[in-house]
């Protein structure tokens, strides 16, 4: 079949920041980046020069590197960002309690056009680390280390109907640590989470670092964590993604069994393949015939 074509490694002009970016999303030719930083500067500018103030969120043109005026503000780190299906709204999650100087308990929404606040009926009592919009655009999944959303019990994962702005009945019980990533199957049949959690509702096979749920929140009993077991204080599934071929996961581990990229079957949880390279893996992206990974892999 030959080698599939990939994007090049050619450098593009990219805006710089004075801190760290934890997540980003691309809408059209605009990159929206969030994390913990207070200033942004043009590509090529040394640190401290030509800086413009930002408060943990910024945007730039992916082709030219031009910094845009989009500049929502928060009083704490933003860990996650997701775009609505139409690209007009951006959802933010993190450690903050204010968004654009108004109360926002660790999750909120802003307009992609100007960064002004948009309505979102959600508030979390603990850190939000993951956000994901369903393929049909109707549901926002929220993951992290919280135990309540809108004063209703939700153990580290929840789902919000974006039409009604109400919580759905999706309420798995993640027993400890946190949820780091969430994705819904492309056909809408199931939801997967990855993180540092060691069990789900008392089950660790499946339920250790990665788990697949029915749409009603019940745990799909399969082999998802029978082979790869990385969770707890020093291991985590950092990213889960989906396409028509399966469920992809990337992990890091100091004490677990795997720190590469793998693809699983949504129904059985069986592993289709594992890229068993040593070196922590932080993100994975299936793109047609190619799967990209962000890692410091070695010894492949």
Residue ranges of model-derived segments:
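Extracytoplasmic surface signature
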Residues: 1-300
